[in-house]
UniProtKB/Swiss-Prot annotation:
Gene name of this polypeptide: rplC
Domain of life: Bacteria
Keyword annotations from UniProtKB, A to Z: Ribonucleoprotein, Ribosomal protein, RNA-binding, rRNA-binding
Family, per entry: Belongs to the universal ribosomal protein uL3 family.
UniProt xrefs under Pfam families: Ribosomal_L3
Function: One of the primary rRNA binding proteins, it binds directly near the 3'-end of the 23S rRNA, where it nucleates assembly of the 50S subunit.
Gene Ontology BP terms: translation
UniProt xrefs under InterPro entries: Ribosomal_uL3, Ribosomal_uL3_bac/org-type, Ribosomal_uL3_CS, Transl_B-barrel_sf
Designated name of the protein: Large ribosomal subunit protein uL3
One MF term in the entry's GO annotations: structural constituent of ribosome
Signal peptide location: none
GO cellular component, one term: cytosolic large ribosomal subunit
The protein's assembly and partners: Part of the 50S ribosomal subunit. Forms a cluster with proteins L14 and L19.
Length: 211
């Protein structure tokens, strides 16, 4: 069945495999998450569960979130996310999902918000080569021509231009789980994931994993 968790990126480190290989890993605090709501195909047209992560005081949340969580009979959470599942009837409102739902060797997709880098030029944002760095030229890091004049008399959509870099939703697919610490709700993922330290991430079964 499909499964997932909300987590928090704690940072990167490295571990050694049994054969001596050094493996770069990202440590994620995955859960515990509480099932707040169920959605079924009969009632809502699709099967999903809504989970909450990072409990907080009711005074720090708005009334809509407090009322929604109170209906579920659970505490108030800072983050609520919906996860598609094959069969929502396998879950009950109030169930606690922890890191132990995953196992070493599982392939997962991790979604997070990339680190924002502000307004950047085309060389940093898109990898343009740029002009000559020598003297006698005033064309160094400029984008150059962005289109023709009379025809088509416009700039095409999706033209690579300077602008905001980062701070967008990014998903990294098929990351392998190296180790699971169920006692501390920690998952070690092989490689890097988007976002800064303490950033919110969503961990789900990989859509491209071999069945």
């Amino acid at each position: 069945m499909n499964k997932g968790l909300i987590g928090k990126k704690l940072g990167m480190t490295q571990i050694f495999a049994e054969d001596g290989r050094r493996i770069p890993v990202t440590v994620v605090e995955a859960g515990p998450c509480v099932v707040i709501q169920k959605k079924t195909k009969e009632k809502d047209g699709y099967s999903a569960i809504q989970v909450g992560f990072n409990s907080q005081e009711a005074a720090k949340a708005n009334s809509a979130v407090v009322g929604h969580c109170k209906t579920a009979g659970s505490g108030v959470f800072s983050f609520l996310r919906e996860l598609r599942v094959d069969n929502a009837d396998q879950y009950s409102v109030g169930d606690v999902l922890s890191a132990e739902i995953f196992a070493p060797g599982d392939l997962v997709d991790v979604t997070g918000t990339s680190i924002g880098k502000g307004f950047q030029g085309v060389m940093k944002r898109w990898g343009f080569k740029g002009g000559r760095a020598s003297h006698g030229s005033r064309f160094h890091r400029a984008p150059g021509s962005i289109g023709c004049s009379a025809t088509p008399s416009r700039v095409f959509k999706n033209k690579k231009m300077p602008g905001q870099l980062g701070n967008e939703k990014v998903t990294v697919q098929r990351l392998k789980i190296v180790r699971v610490d169920a006692a501390d709700n920690l998952i070690l993922l092989n490689g890097a994931i988007p976002g800064s330290t303490n950033g919110l991430v969503l961990i789900k079964d990989s859509v491209k994993a071999k069945k």
